């Protein structure tokens, strides 16, 4: 186990080649958002754009796309038909599959049992069908993790053809493992490592001093961040950032560890400006550019 350091992350994130083009930095397809959670999709795709992905496409329903297009003209759009509770209908699966991307991000704002059993069933169908057939790597977050937890009752962890990163907070990890959040927090490093190996995935166990564990036995503890991250939307930003670094070509463990470090470092800058109480997740996005610029990236 080691603590993620500034040297570690800046060695992993090299300056951009002078002859680079958008294809150099990969593409992210975010399957995210619903009528109730429009902001989750917006924060995730901006997190991906601000962290360097060459192309970011959002597959979502019209109200979400309208909100994102107004804020982020750089984001490509994949319009989807609405299903239960204004979420993405499984009828869109073949349409979504036709979108070319190197990384799939599934989960932010999709909706689950908090909306209805029908919404949960549709989100499960999206995850169960899209993830195994995806040719690249994937990040599973938020309601994507809730779907995976239910699917684990009857089958093994679903995988894309590439690498898989899971980004649970302790409550989501409890649903995935069947252990209580208290049990998980009592042994965060051990729990993350055990399930990273069991699921053959990188596990990002969020919380104070987020733990990043790989199936190869590596384990990092993050030193950056502050309690100002304890609000809805922070995890959506992190999911987008993680997807971007994966798309840029970093291996899954390095992508996750660097994203968590940058996320926390941006939060520390936001807290310095707005205070831990007043800062908001979108303040992290504003801080990322300065963070990269100061380090020649």
Regions found by a protein language model. Give the residues of each.
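Glycine-rich phosphate/dinucleotide-binding loop and adjoining beta-alpha-beta core of small-molecule
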Residues: 1-6, 59-224, 296
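Alpha-helical segments flanking ligand/cofactor-binding loops in enzyme cores
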Residues: 42, 46-47, 128, 193, ...
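Short, small-residue alpha-helix embedded
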Residues: 174-175, 231-262
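Charged C-terminal helix
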Residues: 265-297
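Short pre-catalytic strand/loop immediately N-terminal to key active-site residues, enriched for Gly-Thr
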Residues: 17, 219-233
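Short beta-alpha connecting loops at secondary-structure transitions
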Residues: 177, 223-229, 239, 268-276
